[in-house]
Amino acid sequence: ALVNVYWDKQDSCFVLEVPEQKVTRTSISSRISGKFDSGRFIHYMDIHSHNNMNAFFSRTDDRDEKAARVYAVVGRISSFFPEIKVRIANSRSFVEIDPSVVFEGIVAAGDFPEEWKTAVFLENSTPDSRQEFLKQLAGSDGI
């Protein structure tokens, strides 16, 4: 799944958005919602998940991550300590940085807006697989 992080210049805080998206085991297709006015908000970072695979920047990521911003990928999300990789991009030049420079503190599992659950559509999913995904997203299995 994909999370967009915006900096609110007026209120001096970060705002998270889970855009509508279609996800498969290997890809995410989403659109920028347009509800964050560029006069007030800076699209600061994109975070996406590699689910239970390792956290790494793929060739697809290299091709897609064109904007000057921070990019993060989270992997091994079922592990007690998931993997996180972070980099800064500018004109297809990338510099990996320590994730602790970007992230501080941890939000408790399940502590997110309910509408995020309906923003992610799993391609080729069954009702059972969608329920399992939502349970993982909410942290109900101790994740």
Where do the PLM segments sit?
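Conserved beta-strand-loop surface patch within small alpha/beta domains used
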Residues: 1-45, 52-143
